[in-house]
Regions:
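Short, glycine/small-hydrophobic-rich surface segments
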Residues: 14, 30-61
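Short linear sequence signals and composition-biased patches located at protein termini or domain-edge surfaces
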Residues: 118-184
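Type IV pilin-like appendage domain
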Residues: 52-137
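Short, surface-exposed loop and linker segments with low hydrophobicity and enrichment for Pro/Ser/Thr
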Residues: 46-60, 89-91, 143-155
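Low-complexity, Gly/Pro
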Residues: 6-7, 23-25, 55-57, 176-181
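Secondary-structure transition/capping residues
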Residues: 6-10, 37, 132, 170
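Aliphatic-rich helix starts adjacent to a transmembrane/signal segment
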Residues: 1-31
Length: 184
């Protein structure tokens, strides 16, 4: 039938569209995290930080601040600004956005809330640029400095999407703070 002819390859097209849209969404959210006035020139508004997840040992995750929150966040009450967000890929669960507002009374005690951005993200990888060697390296985890004291912020984030037999790699360039007028 005509429906079968036109429907061939639907899964792959829908999966690819979903993967591209999640990648673009994440790029936009990270871009809003580096806009003035919340991000100042020379600051690192996107950085690796230790996050306490559900009373477990803290994990070092890529973390950023969304001054106005995000449309994906489902608040128990009125939405709050200054939302600290972290990204984590979990086996069988996908890409998780961990978030809570700095204005919450138990910000330091309570673990962050969780929202699934995409169930099809099978992993995160981090791209680092070595200016001395003029080369890129892709790491499966956030990289430590040579002395091991700090965790380095990558220049790019790779999203590894997987659905059935389909694979897609989304690349998000991590923006840096820029000088300019605040967004009104």
């Amino acid at each position: 039938s005509m429906g079968e002819l036109w429907g061939r390859g639907n899964d792959s097209r829908l999966f690819e569209a979903h993967s591209r849209n999640v990648t673009n969404f994440l790029q936009d959210e990270l871009r809003s995290a580096v806009l003035p006035p919340s991000a100042k020139v020379g600051d690192t508004p996107i950085s690796a930080q230790e996050i306490k997840i559900n009373n477990a040992n803290p994990e070092t995750l890529l973390t950023f601040l969304l001054p106005e929150g995000s449309r994906l966040l489902s608040w128990p009450g009125a939405p709050l600004p200054e939302v600290v967000c972290s990204l984590q890929a979990r086996d069988g669960e996908g890409l998780i956005l961990l978030w809570h507002s700095r204005l919450e009374t138990k910000f330091n005690e309570d673990p962050p809330r969780e929202t699934v951005i995409s169930p099809y993200v099978a992993g995160l990888e981090y791209d680092y640029y070595d200016a001395n060697l003029s080369t890129w390296s892709t790491e499966p985890a956030l990289k430590k400095s040579t002395d091991g004291a700090t965790t380095l912020t990558p220049q790019r984030l790779r999203l590894k999407f997987k659905y059935a037999t389909y694979d897609y790699d989304g690349v998000v360039a991590l923006p840096t703070s820029m000088q300019g007028l605040p967004r009104y």
